[in-house]
Amino acid sequence: MIVDKTVINSNSIKHRSVNWILDYEKFTRKNGDFYDISKDYFGFFPGEDEKYQVHDFEKMDDNDLDSLSSVYDLAYFTDTYGVMGNEWYRHRDINETSKSIYGGLSEKDIALLGKLKKRNKPIITEYNTMGFPTPLDVRKSFQEMFGLEWTGWMGRYIASLDTINNPDLPMWIVRAFRNQNNQNWTFKEEGMIFFHIDGRVAVLEKGRHLNNPMPQIYTDKKNQSVYNVPATMIYPFWIDIVINRNDSNEIVSKYLLSPTWEGEKLLAKYNIPKIFPAILHRSIPYTFYYFCGDFADNPTKFRFAKLEGISGLKFLMYNAVDITDRNRFFWEFYMPMIQSIMDDCYQNRLSKK
């Protein structure tokens, strides 16, 4: 089961990389057909002439949800952020804020997750599941259900903090910083921006605040072996800062920031840790993963999905010089991670037959 509430058009499908791996591993529907990326998911379905349909769990009763939890072997909530007005029919600047048309985790989602958890069906969730536009009460239910807590902070690496040279820099971040600090935006180098749900903004610039502006994902030796991932992996995309609230959860991987002395002070001012979870996992008595990053959002090319052994040529699949190339993360980290999770799910299903 794939849940994706952020499908703006056929070129912006957040679960693309999941379907790529399903195709590559030759996972099929019960009738033998491959999963259709444009149909086989729950969430937002864009149409023509600015029309759309929603196919989710909101009109389902308890029996319907119970049936779904029984039928599916694994659930992956790839993106619950949803669709904003400026991204959809208004065609305005996507780097500005706007009202939500559809999105956020819902009470029905929570009900389904509870049933999946009870049946020990593997659950994968990720970045912004607890963030806007998920209601506060639903966020609390999710946190209590899985023993974690979102701090309210999210952030990402920015290749250039110069507003003139980087048109993709979110201007609402710039305005919020100016209003909050009553000072001009003077940043020019690469760095990181952090935004809190209450409106606070923190900006860390290379040299002044950060020795290395790029967050690193660190995985210990045991989990490197379990998931076939490298010891360290750069991650220059959106992350959320989450706290583990249950000792039964395992921190599979951690984010490491590299602040200077001045950066340490700035992080402490906003209570932002320099080491925090990248992947949380629980295996007993239920199987759950939370990816504290926008992991599923990768621009994979489907023409390679049917080529057996293509992973052996992964060094040709991304630009080794461009540190912001999402394909690097897909081939080196995300793909082996998801392959390991899916294989474990498949083996567990076979053992129960």
Give short role names for the model-derived ranges.
Residues V3-K5, Y72-R92, E126-N128, Y290-N298:
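Short loop/turn segments at strand-loop or loop-helix junctions that form parts
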Residues K26, Y76-D79, N120:
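Sec/Tat-exported extracytoplasmic proteins
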Residues L68-S70, L116-K118, N244-R245, R282-S283:
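Extracellular/periplasmic catalytic domains that process cell-envelope and extracellular macromolecules
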Residues W88-S100, G104-V229:
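A glycine-rich, often tryptophan-bearing local segment used as a flexible ligand/cofactor-contacting loop or short
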Residues S70-L74, K118-I124, Y286:
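Loop/turn elements at helix/coil->beta-strand transitions in domains of secreted/extracellular proteins
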Residues N31-G114:
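Post-signal peptide N-terminal segment of secreted/secretory-pathway proteins
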Residues M1-G43, N211, T219-K353:
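Extracellular ligand-binding/catalytic regions of CAZymes and related secreted enzymes
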